[in-house]
Curated annotation (Swiss-Prot):
This is Catechol O-methyltransferase domain-containing protein 1. It holds the Pfam family Methyltransf_3. The gene is COMTD1. The keyword Phosphoprotein does not apply. It is found in: Membrane. It is a single-pass type II membrane protein. It comes from Homo sapiens (Human). Its main location: membrane.
Amino acid sequence: MTQPVPRLSVPAALALGSAALGAAFATGLFLGRRCPPWRGRREQCLLPPEDSRLWQYLLSRSMREHPALRSLRLLTLEQPQGDSMMTCEQAQLLANLARLIQAKKALDLGTFTGYSALALALALPADGRVVTCEVDAQPPELGRPLWRQAEAEHKIDLRLKPALETLDELLAAGEAGTFDVAVVDADKENCSAYYERCLQLLRPGGILAVLRVLWRGKVLQPPKGDVAAECVRNLNERIRRDVRVYISLLPLGDGLTLAFKI
């Protein structure tokens, strides 16, 4: 049975997480003047368009991407559905948060080519472990040579089965409360179930990241019959009301929710 990793106190862990987000604002992920109250003012203060020169400047002055990670990102973008991959700025923020809380164990739901798994693995110590879940065996094999090139393959534990099965197996094996970070970027129909199980597997002070929580803007008014959009909208409301976590929903990529377990 896997032993729980040493736990930071909840206030300390949350303070660290807050510090990381503050650093992200300070170093350029969020530009412009001090953000106004969310109601009643028209001042624009968040992100420039991703195809703008200002956005490219932002990335060029903030990104520190491992060569193998960059190669894997470019390779992934060439694949069908490659644009659904975690963005480089999301990956770097999550990796920095993992370093900040001295993470050793991570969950990654939705491997694809393993870009997010590799980003996390590179942030963990030599004895760290990333359990990553995928149902299609082909995409991870595209990324495996680059996991090896980055000398991080030994940290990546690929589970080729439905993510819910892997999560239930981890819980049955007594690993509840032993993971430091969890990233959810899998099918949206099961996103609420993923959230609940990941929260059980996280230790207090652990970080749960949910990607694509804006679902191309469809969460505002899910189209009739769009089950995925409805599920994402419901999860957003669920997390907003969840007293077990502190949250931030960030406008990075297609939306990134960070939930810090209390």
